[in-house]
Amino acid sequence: PEDILAFENKEVEVIPITEVMKKDSVVMYKGIRYRGYVYINPSKMKVIRTSYSEDGISVDNVYYDNVIHICVYEGRQMLYGKDITKKMFAGIFPTETLNQMILADMNFMGVNNKGYQYQATLCVPESSVYSLANITIGFDNQMSIKKAE
């Protein structure tokens, strides 16, 4: 029929962001200077978000998730380094919600008596929906993740 072109099923090419974003922070704790680094690396892991038009037609939008590398230094000595992925937040957020989110940002919040503190932002692309998670890396290099209150 004549409307076949209007409903042609074509796969849309999504252009990934290839720029690595770097952040670093310096904090003092008990007279020791710590430097926390965050490297936000685009990946090829796809996140599909379904939205609906005014006519009720579903549209799948494809986004690319990030892998975030975090590390803590005291002077030139690296005390901790690890890649963080969205999969590490399973069990903290509902699976259905997590599947539509990307690991968007990470901030080094400081050092306290529990260890190195980071805060991750996971968000649903092109929406105001986001969740925060607090990451603690203990001085024994054990990591714990909790939903921010």
Where are these regions (language model features)?
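Acidic, glycine-rich flexible loop segments
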Residues: 88-128
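Residue-level detector of short, conserved catalytic/binding motifs and their immediate flanks
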Residues: 68, 116, 133
